[in-house]
């Protein structure tokens, strides 16, 4: 008997839509804040990882590609990727990159730096992305945040796709920074 489908089983489409919209207009990168705030909100007020289990479009996309379309080798995830040290180390690295992005946005807002119309993949490789933004549409700091945030989201998607192909479809979920943060919140909340 087939499992009944729910509306949230199709959120993988939102992940594709997000990256497609950002390819044509960088300002759509702000929509990614939903994936940053909603898991934290649900963990704080719900005390669970409902977002990760049901609402994460990226995890669903990896399942769809890896399992349904057989793009994954389905090899076991290396133990070190599931270790506490790797989880928190990757989270710290990720938060450092996020903090740097926010700082760059601040510098643009303060007039101390100019807008960089480029995506940085893997926090290193500059990819010109200027066609996605028309100067003057919004203030420069709003655009700078968009470029930085889209860089972060696209880099994490690429990391997730790489580990999906090499290992199990949802290997990214084993060390996803949002999953690590929500897990920590749930542990703290359930101690009470």
Positions of PLM-derived features:
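Non-ligating segments of multi-cofactor redox enzymes
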Residues: 1-192
């Amino acid at each position: 008997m087939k499992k009944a489908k729910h509306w949230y089983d199709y959120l993988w489409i939102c992940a594709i839509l997000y990256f497609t919209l950002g390819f044509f207009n960088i300002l759509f990168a702000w929509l990614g804040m939903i994936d940053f705030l909603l898991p934290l909100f649900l963990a704080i007020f719900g005390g669970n990882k409902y977002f990760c289990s049901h609402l994460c479009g990226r995890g669903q996309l990896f399942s769809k590609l890896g399992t349904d379309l057989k793009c994954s080798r389905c090899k076991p995830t290396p133990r070190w990727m599931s270790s506490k040290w790797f989880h928190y180390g990757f989270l710290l690295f990720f938060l450092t990159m996020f903090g740097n992005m926010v700082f760059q946005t601040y510098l643009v807002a303060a007039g101390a730096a100019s807008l960089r119309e480029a995506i940085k993949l893997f926090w290193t490789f500059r990819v010109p992305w200027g066609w996605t933004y028309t100067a003057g549409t919004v203030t420069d700091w709003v655009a700078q945040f968009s470029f930085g945030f889209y860089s972060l989201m696209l880099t994490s998607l690429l990391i997730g796709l790489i580990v999906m192909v090499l290992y199990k479809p949802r290997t990214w979920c084993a060390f996803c920074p949002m999953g690590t943060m929500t897990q920590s919140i749930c542990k703290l909340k359930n101690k009470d």
